[in-house]
From Swiss-Prot:
Keywords: Chaperone, Cytoplasm, Plasmid, Stress response. SUPFAM superfamilies: GroES-like. It comes from Rhizobium meliloti (strain 1021). This is Co-chaperonin GroES 4. One of its GO terms (cellular component) is cytoplasm. NCBIfam families: PRK00364.1-2, PRK00364.1-5, PRK00364.2-2, PRK00364.2-4, PRK00364.2-5.
């Protein structure tokens, strides 16, 4: 998805989940029904930032391309251009990987 297809507002980000492993280290294949949804993703697009008390826009700490960790129940699942993505607030992000 190109970042121009959808632009989140304010302090929201669009995240693509990173696919979880299909096999365990021991070689056991994990069926889709038993897999947990990954809590790791890549930021696809970011909003302009939230406004502080004085009305000034505070830019986000994350940017498109960052790999992040987020909470299990974070965000809202959406389908944009046929791709399953998440929209969440920056506060739902626990940290940036790397």
């Amino acid at each position: 998805m190109a970042s121009t297809d959808f632009r989140p507002l304010h302090d929201r980000v669009v995240v693509r989940r990173v696919e979880s492993e299909e096999k365990t280290k021991g070689g056991v294949i994990i069926p889709d029904t038993a897999k947990e949804k990954p809590q790791e993703g890549e930021i696809v697009a970011v909003g302009s930032g939230a406004r502080d008390e004085s009305g000034k826009v505070v830019p986000l700490d994350v940017k498109a391309g960052d790999r992040i960790l987020f909470g299990k129940w974070s965000g809202t699942e959406v389908k944009i251009n046929g791709e399953d993505l998440l929209i969440m607030k920056e506060a739902d992000i626990m940290g940036v990987i790397g």
